[in-house]
């Protein structure tokens, strides 16, 4: 089974002996995750904007229908 304590000691030792190599490796490992997060955030923002636009369109339509019904009654 994986010995987490030994692995953690190895990582700490590696970070102490070669900090630039360690940071480079960590940054390279995390970059795809940051990019995926940015893309998903952008897509979510676009979806929210589209939903809000659609809701405004429906609200405007309902207002126009109500206005037409009022004019029809008069």
Swiss-Prot record:
Gene Ontology annotations for the cellular component aspect, listed alphabetically: membrane
Top-level lineage group: Eukaryota
Classification via Pfam families: UPF0542 (PF15086)
Main location: membrane
Topology with respect to the bilayer: Single-pass membrane protein
Keyword match Transmembrane: yes
Basic and acidic residues biased stretches: 55-66
Regions annotated as coiled coil: 42-74
Region (Disordered): 55-74
Protein localization: Membrane
Keyword terms: Coiled coil, Membrane, Transmembrane, Transmembrane helix
Membrane spanning residue stretches: 20-40
Family, similarity comment: Belongs to the SMIM15 family.
Protein name: Small integral membrane protein 15
Protein's gene: Smim15
